[in-house]
């Protein structure tokens, strides 16, 4: 996290999408994007920026709140108000760089994600304290009837049980099979 920004991750995602589209064996009408946690935030932004190139979006515990909370110098409930002074924030032993914070000030992930017009699958645990379930609830509001939303009761961010992981995987697999092959 020290040398990364959400904007940089989005740029990487766009480059990956371009690469996938350049492959001869890829059916360009059947490209889906999947993301977990901050990767879910990034995936939703890539889909919003490239709506014509993405046919479906799958998100597990998306974490756009990381961006919004950084504007208040908070990261997953941890005060990181010393980030400008130190040049980084210490979050659970990980250095989060000043660039991450500065980048977050100019981003609005939900506004970018709202440009995506296709179907979406959301899976979130109701005991997630890393990325609040409110993030997926907000995405559901944005995407409306185009979004399926599975709440896995008792699951936290890492889905630390076989049953939780199976529910998450089954939901995404059924959705992607339907959207890509149906």
Summary of predicted features, one role per range:
Residues 3-23:
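Alpha/beta-hydrolase active-site loop
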Residues 25-36:
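Alpha/beta-hydrolase fold nucleophile elbow
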Residues 129-135:
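Conserved alpha/beta-hydrolase "acid-adjacent" motif
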Residues 140-158:
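Catalytic histidine neighborhood in serine/cysteine hydrolases
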